[in-house]
UniProtKB/Swiss-Prot annotation:
One of its GO terms (cellular component) is CBF3 complex. Coiled coil: none annotated. Keywords: Ubl conjugation pathway. This is E3 ubiquitin ligase complex SCF subunit sconC. The keyword Cell inner membrane does not apply. Essential component of the SCF (SKP1-CUL1-F-box protein) E3 ubiquitin ligase complexes, which mediate the ubiquitination and subsequent proteasomal degradation of target proteins. Controls sulfur metabolite repression, probably by mediating the inactivation or degradation of the metR transcription factor. The lineage of its organism: Eukaryota, Fungi, Dikarya, Ascomycota, Pezizomycotina. The keyword Cell wall biogenesis/degradation does not apply. InterPro entries: SKP1, SKP1-like, SKP1-like_dim_sf, SKP1/BTB/POZ_sf, Skp1_comp_dimer, Skp1_comp_POZ.
Amino acid sequence: MSTTVTLTSSDGVDLTVDRDVAERSVLIKNMLEDLGESGEAIPIPNVNEVVLKKVIEWCTHHKNDPPSTGDDDDSRRKTTDIDEWDQKFMQVDQEMLFEIILAANYLDIKALLDVGCKTVANMIKGKSPEEIRKTFNIQNDFTPEEEDQIRRENEWAEE
């Protein structure tokens, strides 16, 4: 069994990766099982080279982590705590952060998806809607009347 696999990014760049690193992705693991020992490059059509390298960096750091136990991992989902290495890893611009989240979702890397989503949750935590809009450059498309109506309908949530 080959110890490395070749992944082809959406922009056509081949990256050679240790098999155990690549198999942090459920999608790639399943593709490798289907392909057998063909040695063919695995196309990753939704992820460009820069993002794929970043994902590989994360997978390399976490290659010895125990596999995710899936949805029954409630304690993991109820907290927004992120370990120090992952916090530093996620200190990227917003576009890259969202690209990493999309790639983790596409590649089925639950732990990386969790870290990305927790990073976004921490960016939102404790902020007003106006501050959140500013953080993510979101245009407010409600009229003042609509905002008042929404506030009245949701008064109970602010108690």
